[in-house]
Amino acid sequence: MSITPQEALQRCIEHRELFHDEMTDMMRLIMSGEMAPELVAGLLVALRTKKETVGEIAAAAQVMREFATSVHIDDRSHLVDVVGTGGDGAHTFNISTAAMFVAAAAGAKIAKHGNRSVSSKSGSADVLEALGANLALSAEQVAKCISTVGAGFMFAPNHHPAMKNVVPIRKQLGVRTIFNILGPLTNPADAKRILMGVFHADLVGIQARVLQALGMEHALVVYGRDGLDEISLEGPTLVGELKDGVVREYEIHPKDFGLHTAPTNSFKVANAEESKRIVLDVIDNKPSAASDIVCLNAGATLYVAGIAPDIASGIAKAKAAIASGAARQKLDAFVAASQSN
């Protein structure tokens, strides 16, 4: 081993970075359950206190992928994930989940990776269950769903069994750790394209560079200036774009795409049932600000997936997919496929 857990802890306390092989060794000990819980807790807090680096996050993500149950997709063209870190405290309806079906209806192949609610009122898994989907699918069944329907959902606990060694420690700590930002980086289908929302402006550049280190093809990391971990309709959104191996950061605004602004708190829900109702209203072509924010995020997904040349074109395709009824058909096909497996 390159370093002991105690040495790694001391290094972090001194605000010194762990090298790639050192972080890899520590993460393998954590994921295998071989590191004492007290040391795991200490190391996670020390990493957070000194601020995790791009190299440390990338190494940790690679190890999580090693321990994950993979989903093998043969035709990987236009394969994309649309996901948020969560933890933004906005308690909105499931924007990225609605965008998943709209983007799939417009030609993207969605490999969505998500979980139940941690800090929100409704996680992606919660609203998909409310919509009638079966989440208890094997990796092979998810792969079939993605191949036949064009959209699949990988329920994180089904694909990351080693997380059982970490969950009790995270719950006891009750503070954010590196694991709060690892989920979106560890897609079991190894999608090389992603629209990722984050809970803090500082993470935009960091996560974009982590995705660069992980060999992603095209990524948009977004943070609404209002605090939303999606592209916001309230005002500007900070974007970190990875394309052709280069990261650049910029801002976008709803007005750039001819959309009216709307306050994020107008999208708040109390539970998964409320989220389901809004998702269905959007999918069923009821014009609203909710529909606009879904089309905005679906449009960005289509851009990242390589279906649209830019976000504006993606939004037009998203609106057309809803108006034609294709998005509703995609949702119904997804639910039926999940239940037939």
UniProtKB/Swiss-Prot annotation:
Any Pfam family hit: Glycos_trans_3N
One biological process term in Gene Ontology: L-tryptophan biosynthetic process
EC numbers, comma separated: 2.4.2.18
Enzyme class: transferase
Taxonomic path: Bacteria, Pseudomonadati, Pseudomonadota, Betaproteobacteria, Burkholderiales
Organism: Polynucleobacter asymbioticus (strain DSM 18221 / CIP 109841 / QLW-P1DMWA-1)
Protein name stated in the entry: Anthranilate phosphoribosyltransferase
Function description: Catalyzes the transfer of the phosphoribosyl group of 5-phosphorylribose-1-pyrophosphate (PRPP) to anthranilate to yield N-(5'-phosphoribosyl)-anthranilate (PRA).
Entry cofactors: Mg(2+)
Reactions that this protein is recorded to catalyse: N-(5-phospho-beta-D-ribosyl)anthranilate + diphosphate = 5-phospho-alpha-D-ribose 1-diphosphate + anthranilate
Keywords: Amino-acid biosynthesis, Aromatic amino acid biosynthesis, Glycosyltransferase, Magnesium, Metal-binding, Transferase, Tryptophan biosynthesis
Cofactor: record remark: Binds 2 magnesium ions per monomer.
